[in-house]
Design a protein with these regions (language model features):
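Hydrophobic-ligand binding "helix-grip"
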Residues: 158-195
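Bacterial Sec-dependent signal peptides at the C-terminal "C-region" and cleavage site
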Residues: 16-23
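Bacterial N-terminal signal peptides
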Residues: 8-15
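A short acidic/glycine-rich loop-to-helix N-cap element
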Residues: 182-187, 213-231
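Hydrophobic ligand-binding cavity/cleft-lining segments
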Residues: 23-151
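Bacterial N-terminal signal peptides that target proteins for export
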Residues: 1-6
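Alpha-helical oligomerization segments
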Residues: 221-248
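Compact beta-sheet-dominated globular domain cores
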Residues: 188-214
């Protein structure tokens, strides 16, 4: 009797996960494992270290803002790349696009982002310096130039772009001057990006993001660079998602 109940429960769980995967945007269900699918279904933020653009798990052509996110990473040929996905029900969250615009255009929020290095057991502001240099506004479009310092790296100039409309929401940030670690040029101009979109699919809203860098892959320290990079992308994205007022 107990074996029968366990078997029935497993069959039901498999059926529910299969039904859920069929409601996902194309390719998520093809590329992901069951743990990732289950996490997305439960409202967890999924973060994947995919290293290169060929490993992106969503395909072009579904939504123009998805295409812009992918193109942003493609254009720099990122060789350190993280993919972030979050799902929320559409019902009760119809204001999410307006929320996203309001949150991402406020660059002063950068000062509140905390980076936590769990391996070293320390936390610090991710951006200890943020200064707005210029701002341009048009219909459903904003561009902001800023001067930023990221922890452990030099100060640099950055531009962010926000666009929104029927397809959803799009955000892009890119460095406009090089980043240095001590005297070493760690990232060339334009080679560090964060690109985020929010779109509706099959009764749900999805936040999809790529954070990437084109930088030297130095033997013996690649794993440590990836660990710290993924940690920063995670803290940046999680911070903003938690700023949204989401109903589940």
């Amino acid at each position: 009797m107990k074996k029968s109940l366990v078997f029935t429960a497993l069959v039901a769980l498999t059926f529910l996960q299969s039904a859920f995967s069929q409601s996902l945007p194309p390719s998520f269900s093809e590329e992901w494992g069951q743990t990732e699918l289950k996490g997305l279904q439960e409202g967890k933020i999924i973060i994947r270290n995919i290293q290169r653009c060929k490993n992106i798990s969503i395909k072009k052509g579904m939504n123009p803002y998805i295409d812009k996110v992918i193109k942003t990473a493609d254009d720099i040929n990122a060789n350190y790349l993280a993919e972030i996905i979050y799902r929320m029900p559409k019902e009760g969250n119809e204001s999410i696009i307006n929320q996203a615009v309001s949150v991402f255009e406020n660059i002063n929020l950068y000062k509140e982002i905390i980076y936590t290095d769990e391996k070293k057991g320390k936390s610090c502001p991710l951006f200890p310096l943020v200064e707005e240099r210029f701002r341009k506004d048009a219909d459903y479009w904003i561009q902001i130039g800023s001067h930023i310092k990221m922890d452990m790296l030099s100060e640099y100039d950055s531009e962010l772009e926000i666009e929104w409309g029927a397809p959803g929401f799009f955000f892009k940030q890119q460095n406009k001057t090089p980043l240095y670690w001590k005297s070493f040029k760690a990232v060339k101009e334009g080679n560090m990006i964060a690109a985020i979109c929010c779109f509706e699919w099959s009764g749900s809203y999805y936040v999809y993001a790529l954070g990437g860098v084109r930088a030297p892959r130095i033997p013996f320290v690649i794993a440590e660079i990836e660990r710290q990079f993924i940690g920063r992308i995670e803290d940046f994205t999680v911070f903003y998602i938690k700023k949204f007022k989401i109903k589940r």
